[in-house]
Amino acid sequence: MAASATFYRLLSRCGKAARSRPLGARCFGVRVSPTGEKITHTGQVYDDKDYRRIRFVDRQKEVNENFAIDLIAEQPVSEVQTRVIACDGGGGALGHPKVYINLDKETKTGTCGYCGLQFRQHPH
């Protein structure tokens, strides 16, 4: 019983609070390690005796609380009419190189490899 509870806590981002939330709800806030240090989007956290903690002796570790992967996951799947869609990430200087995504595969949704946006062909 205790092992399954620990496993469930490790899988969920927010620990015990995740059980009471609906599946689509987002956990606001930053994950914190047992030492009280904020965990970055890459999972970077240092032990108490790690020499790399010297960077944060007189300063607080600044972590952006809006992880990009979480923000992209909140975007709804876009319904399109064509079977091939071109994604350029919004275009202009803020976009990425144009990629063409084939939507008639078995997965039924196509994901852009650059920005993570998802597309689905609208059935006619």
UniProtKB/Swiss-Prot annotation:
Gene3D superfamilies attached to this UniProt entry: q5lls5 like domains
Major subcellular location class: mitochondrion
The keyword Glycosyltransferase is assigned to this record: no
Transit peptide interval: 1-28
GO terms under cellular component: mitochondrial inner membrane; respiratory chain complex I
GO annotation terms (biological process): mitochondrial electron transport, NADH to ubiquinone
Keyword Endoplasmic reticulum: no
N6-acetyllysine modified-residue sites: 98
InterPro entries assigned to the protein according to its UniProt record, in alphabetical order: NDUFS6, Znf_CHCC
Subunit and interaction comment: Mammalian complex I is composed of 45 different subunits. This is a component of the iron-sulfur (IP) fragment of the enzyme.
Protein name per Swiss-Prot or TrEMBL: NADH dehydrogenase [ubiquinone] iron-sulfur protein 6, mitochondrial
Organism from which the protein derives: Macaca fascicularis (Crab-eating macaque)
Gene name in the database record: NDUFS6
